[in-house]
């Protein structure tokens, strides 16, 4: 490291406060500290300027580093890799502008999100008096950083960036896979396309055979001519499609109930409480004062672990076997469905292995494992997310959906036959999603192993 030089953070960057020009953009995207996590935007919603809070003041540009002043160990940071002219960010962010003559912006970002720097920021934050741990740029500007020449910086980036790119590609693939599963779920269980196609055909005076053909069209998206060709070229697939269409009812009926007055559902389908579909478990946090309860054995899921995750494969905290067994009734198996119910309400994920959660999460252990995907997608519907938040509001500042209320939430439930058919169609999507998530965990571990050695000049 003889050619590496020591700088303070203040030597190679500054905390910039560019005033956002609201006259240029009547509609903006406001980014608060809770809207980013581990270099990803969680929310990017357009807002009218008149609806913005007072802390919406800072403009950003490509190459900036956003880093939350509040609780710096929580991963609320982001590298701005595009021009985002209509984005305004909270004053609770440090907007760090690197000195490009000394350090590449991407390289400084790697330094700032390293475990060593994060621990330093946490120490500074916790040493300051206040309602919650907080840093300012001035309080951390003396942080000592070893910086190589820019050519070496680029070589390090060339090693780390492909890992990040592969992780991002897997993430995008998973998002696409989930959209495919969501589209099928919506067609079958929200819009009831196969049932409505049958009902309309019968209403038009067609035979039951013709009605089932109409349902086959709705399910497959094929024309009658294409279905005829399918029956000849792929008879097994055609027969499977016919059996699927046959499983759907022919009629829509009104369901009376507090939450669904006047709503039509397929005949024979029922409104069932979540507690009728599985065991409901509210998590619990073992005592932090007992160090034996924490280790590397059992995932301990908290709400930040759930963001944008179909399957939870990585957690910031883990329990020891001792800690997990101390509250053994809180164990949830693989393919349990976790729902965030306090503060950030409505996140839904599935476990990838036996786990525990904290008390902000209610989980469903499905009675029938083949219903996992159906239950997951039911709880992921936008209308359900809104309903969960409405139930949790209760007139208090902090959203809180208790376990009793959560257990009584009802969802439209078809016959087991249809649930099994649906599971068969989407299970490969979920298996591929899990595989990608596990690969991302492995790539992250490789990255985290390499990064400190690269940043210390050991490689």
From Swiss-Prot:
Coiled coil: none annotated. Keywords: DNA-binding, Repeat, Restriction system. One of its GO terms (molecular function) is DNA binding. It comes from the Bacteria. The keyword Membrane does not apply. GO terms for biological process: DNA restriction-modification system. It holds the Pfam family Methylase_S. Belongs to the type-I restriction system S methylase family. Type I restriction and modification enzymes are complex, multifunctional systems which require ATP, S-adenosyl methionine and Mg(2+) as cofactors and, in addition to their endonucleolytic and methylase activities, are potent DNA-dependent ATPases. The specificity (S) subunit of a type I restriction enzyme; this subunit dictates DNA sequence specificity. The M and S subunits together form a methyltransferase (MTase) that methylates adenosines in the sequence 5'-RAACN(5)TAG-3'. Methylation protects against cleavage by HindI. In the presence of the R subunit the complex can also act as an endonuclease, binding to the same target sequence but cutting the DNA some distance from this site. Whether the DNA is cut or modified depends on the methylation state of the target sequence. When the target site is unmodified, the DNA is cut. Contains two DNA recognition domains, each specifying recognition of one of the two defined components of the target sequence. The type I restriction/modification system is composed of three polypeptides R, M and S; the restriction enzyme has stoichiometry R(2)M(2)S(1) while the methyltransferase is M(2)S(1). This is Type I restriction enzyme HindI specificity subunit. It comes from Haemophilus influenzae (strain ATCC 51907 / DSM 11121 / KW20 / Rd). The gene is hsdS.
């Amino acid at each position: 490291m003889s050619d590496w030089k020591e700088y303070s953070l203040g030597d190679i960057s500054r905390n910039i406060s560019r005033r956002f020009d609201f006259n240029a953009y009547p509609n903006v995207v406001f980014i608060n500290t809770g809207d980013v996590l581990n270099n990803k935007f969680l929310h990017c919603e357009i807002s009218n300027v008149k609806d913005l809070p007072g802390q919406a003041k800072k403009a950003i540009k490509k190459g900036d580093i956003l880093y939350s002043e509040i609780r710096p160990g929580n991963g609320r940071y982001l590298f701005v890799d595009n021009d985002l002219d209509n984005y305004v960010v909270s004053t609770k962010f440090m907007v760090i502008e690197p000195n490009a003559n000394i350090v590449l912006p991407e390289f400084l970002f790697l330094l700032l999100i390293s475990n060593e720097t994060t621990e330093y920021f946490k120490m500074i934050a916790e040493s300051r008096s206040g309602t919650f741990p907080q840093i300012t740029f001035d309080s951390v500007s003396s942080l000592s950083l070893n910086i190589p020449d820019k050519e070496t910086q680029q070589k390090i980036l060339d090693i780390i960036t492909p890992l990040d790119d592969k992780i991002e590609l897997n993430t995008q693939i998973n998002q696409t896979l989930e959209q495919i599963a969501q589209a099928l779920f919506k067609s079958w269980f929200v819009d009831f396309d196969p049932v409505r196609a049958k009902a309309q055909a019968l209403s038009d005076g067609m035979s039951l055979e013709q009605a089932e053909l109409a349902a086959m069209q709705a399910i497959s998206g094929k024309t009658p001519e294409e279905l005829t060709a399918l029956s000849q070229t792929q008879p097994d697939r055609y027969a499977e499609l016919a059996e699927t269409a046959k499983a759907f009812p022919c009629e829509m009926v009104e369901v009376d109930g507090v939450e669904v007055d006047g709503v039509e559902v397929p005949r024979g389908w029922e409104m069932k409480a979540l507690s009728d579909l599985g065991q409901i478990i509210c998590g619990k946090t073992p005592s932090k004062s007992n160090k034996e309860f924490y280790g590397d054995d059992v995932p301990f899921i908290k709400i930040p672990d759930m963001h944008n995750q179909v399957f939870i494969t990585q957690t910031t905290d883990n329990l020891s076997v001792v800690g997990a067994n101390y509250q053994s009734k809180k164990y949830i198996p693989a393919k349990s469905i976790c729902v965030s119910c306090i503060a950030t309400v409505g996140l839904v994920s599935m476990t990838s292995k036996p786990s525990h959660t904290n008390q902000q999460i209610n989980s469903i252990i499905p009675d029938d494992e083949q219903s996992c995907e159906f239950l997951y997608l039911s709880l992921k519907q936008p209308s359900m997310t809104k309903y969960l938040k409405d139930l949790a509001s209760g007139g208090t500042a902090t959203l809180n959906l208790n376990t009793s209320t959560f257990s009584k939430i009802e969802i439209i439930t078809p016959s087991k036959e249809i649930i099994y058919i649906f599971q068969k169609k989407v299970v490969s999507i979920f298996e591929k999603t899990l595989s990608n998530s596990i690969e991302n965990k492995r790539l992250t571990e490789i990255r985290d192993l390499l990064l400190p050695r690269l940043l210390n000049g050991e490689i």
